């Protein structure tokens, strides 16, 4: 699986603003917050957790990567962030009204066990998202321009893997014991800053960042030149409009 070690600042400056694009759909699915509690599992640098808190939820983050937690606590000091990782969260059964994992189950070694763990600590609703059209397509285009062979990415063993579609996600969650998971697909356009995107590559964020760091000097120069070419070709008013799609799942606890 991807190594996120030390990527907190680079992630906060780049993909955090993309991943929070699910906030509206999730908030709409969760209903009125009242004084209900919410756990954001794999909360990263805290941008989505903060969106939940701003909407009135009593929100808590849970993030295993130390530099992610450091950024979250620095930028959102009013929101508690715990150290914890799937599929063994440090919480009691039914400790939170709502439990959500945003773009987490596509990164874990055992998606079904991890999904079951989300269900365990929820008392009301459980929710998760995955990419159906992910940020990797941009970097594949960069690799093609640079005449570099893109990394294929690590695949899970067949018995652990699942199809990254609405139906495939629903089947996996059903296998994990989620009662009546409702899965829909949303699409939005992320207006990305090219400088921040490049910082994510140099900072080792995700598969593209790890691929870039593994290149020799000549490969890095080719990759950078191809990135600048793609950005110049796709940019509108200095921003990159990049379409992405996600499957959003919500299920009642029982």
Which residues does each PLM region occupy?
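Conserved Class I S-adenosyl-L-methionine
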Residues: 19, 45-47, 160-254
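A short, conserved alpha-helix within the catalytic core of class I
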Residues: 108-117
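Conserved class I S-adenosyl-L-methionine
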Residues: 1-34, 47-51, 67-75
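Class I SAM-dependent methyltransferase SAM/SAH-binding core
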Residues: 37-88
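Nucleotide donor/acceptor-binding cores
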Residues: 35-37, 124
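Conserved catalytic/acceptor-binding region of the Class I
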Residues: 112, 123-193
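A conserved beta-strand element that flanks and buttresses the S-adenosyl-L-methionine
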Residues: 100
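Short catalytic micro-motifs in class I SAM-dependent methyltransferases
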Residues: 103-104
């Amino acid at each position: 699986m991807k190594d996120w070690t030390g990527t907190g600042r680079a992630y906060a400056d780049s993909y955090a603003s993309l991943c929070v694009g699910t906030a509206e759909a999730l908030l709409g699915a969760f209903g009125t917050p009242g004084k209900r509690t919410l756990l954001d599992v794999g909360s990263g640098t805290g941008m989505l957790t903060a969106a939940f808190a701003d909407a009135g939820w009593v929100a808590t983050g849970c993030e295993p990567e130390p530099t992610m937690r450091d950024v979250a606590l620095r930028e959102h000091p009013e929101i508690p962030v715990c150290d914890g990782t799937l599929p063994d969260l440090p919480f009691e059964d039914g400790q939170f009204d709502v439990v959500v994992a945003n773009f987490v189950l596509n990164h874990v070694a055992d998606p079904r066990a991890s999904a079951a763990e989300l269900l365990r600590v929820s008392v009301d609703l459980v929710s998760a998202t995955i990419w159906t059209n992910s940020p990797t397509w941009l970097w594949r285009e960069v690799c093609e321009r640079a005449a570099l062979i893109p990394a294929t990415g690590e695949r899970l063993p067949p018995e652990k893997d699942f199809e990254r579609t609405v139906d495939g996600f629903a089947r996996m969650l059903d296998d994990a014991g989620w009662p009546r998971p409702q899965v829909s697909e949303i699409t939005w356009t992320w207006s990305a800053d090219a400088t921040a995107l490049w910082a994510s590559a140099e900072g080792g964020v995700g598969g593209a960042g790890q691929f870039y760091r593994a290149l020799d000097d000549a490969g890095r120069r080719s990759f950078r030149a191809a990135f600048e070419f793609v950005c110049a070709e796709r940019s509108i008013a200095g921003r990159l409009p990049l379409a992405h799609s996600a499957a959003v799942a919500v299920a009642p606890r029982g």
